[in-house]
């Protein structure tokens, strides 16, 4: 393998890895803070991709249209997520009824999927890249597509923003404290319900952002729901439930490994995430080191 080929696969793998991270980060954040495994994450990702096709179609395949999709779609999804948390999930926290949470998020995924089919039909849609992002750069003899570079940079910025929010702000401090003792925070006058709503909305927004970013990479179809949900769960389990650092490392590692496997054996490439997860679980176990030390308490 030449050095240029190595770089080609590395760039492609990093791009894939950060796309995986967007969907997994939202899933992991909601689990780590709220203790809710959001089975609607794949549907949210799919919805983000479809909404991106609408925004870009109305604004033209321009840089401005793509930037508007990046800005508008996650916000719309986050607002819808906030409403879903208030109306559906909030009542389940006190009893920590995981079965009810599973059923509610699963029902939400069916609702989103049904809405997408109703609005867009079942045919495939495509998102054209703006001319400014459709070509590539030559880097040490390798080809780096501009859009891949944008995805990588955006992924780094989003990861940094998540860490800054969690560890550099009062909201992040309260969020982490709510995991340890929600009741105590409530006694101290913190509106924990509002905090949880914000976390869930942020997680939904991240998932929708993943759909927007991934939309130009291929056809946008209803199959995106499963295509996004399964890898996101694999990343979360591989990195450790509730461990945001682990999710980032797992997503990027899986993306890079899958890229190199694709070069050698395209038929085996889809098995890469499962193989990596299996090896990691055998070596480490399923828990890993959590971003947040304990699961949400049942009280408060």
Protein language model features and the residues they cover:
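Cytosolic-side transmembrane-helix boundaries in multi-pass membrane proteins
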Residues: 119, 180-187, 191-194, 264-300
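Short, non-helical or kinked segments that cap or interrupt transmembrane helices
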Residues: 27-49, 66, 95-100, 171, ...
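Helix-loop-helix "hairpin" substructures at the membrane interface of multi-pass membrane proteins
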Residues: 143-220, 244-250
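Transmembrane helix-bundle core of multi-pass membrane transporters
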Residues: 92, 98-168, 195-198, 260, ...
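Inter-helical junctions in multi-pass inner-membrane proteins, predominant
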Residues: 2-12, 166-170, 196-236, 258-271
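Membrane-embedded helix boundary and interhelical linker motif in transport proteins
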Residues: 11, 33-83
């Amino acid at each position: 393998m030449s050095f240029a080929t190595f770089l080609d696969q590395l760039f492609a793998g990093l791009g894939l890895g950060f796309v995986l991270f967007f969907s997994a980060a939202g899933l992991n954040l909601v689990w780590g803070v709220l203790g809710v495994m959001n089975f609607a994450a794949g549907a949210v990702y799919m919805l983000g991709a479809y909404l991106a096709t609408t925004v870009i179609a109305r604004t033209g395949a321009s840089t401005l249209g793509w930037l508007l999709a990046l800005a508008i779609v996650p916000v719309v999804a986050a607002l819808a997520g906030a409403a879903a948390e208030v109306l559906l999930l909030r009542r389940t926290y006190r009893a920590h009824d995981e079965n009810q949470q599973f059923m509610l998020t699963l029902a939400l995924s069916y609702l989103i999927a049904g809405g997408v089919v109703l609005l867009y039909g079942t045919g495939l849609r495509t998102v054209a890249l703006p001319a400014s992002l459709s070509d590539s750069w030559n880097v040490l003899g390798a080809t780096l597509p501009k859009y891949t570079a944008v995805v990588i940079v955006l992924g780094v910025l989003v990861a940094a923003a998540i860490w800054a929010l969690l560890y550099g702000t009062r909201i992040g401090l309260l969020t982490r404290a709510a995991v340890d003792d929600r009741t105590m925070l409530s006694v101290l006058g913190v509106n924990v319900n509002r905090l949880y709503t914000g976390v869930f909305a942020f997680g939904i927004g991240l998932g929708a952002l993943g759909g927007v970013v991934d939309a130009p990479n291929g056809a946008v179809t209803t199959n995106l729901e499963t295509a996004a949900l399964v890898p996101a769960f694999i990343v979360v389990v591989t990195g450790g439930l509730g461990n945001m650092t682990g999710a980032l490392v797992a997503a990027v590692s899986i993306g890079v490994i899958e890229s190199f496997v694709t070069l050698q054996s395209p038929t085996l490439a889809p098995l890469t995430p499962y193989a990596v997860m299996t090896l990691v679980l055998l070596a480490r176990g399923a828990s890993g080191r959590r971003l947040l030390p304990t699961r949400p308490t049942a009280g408060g």
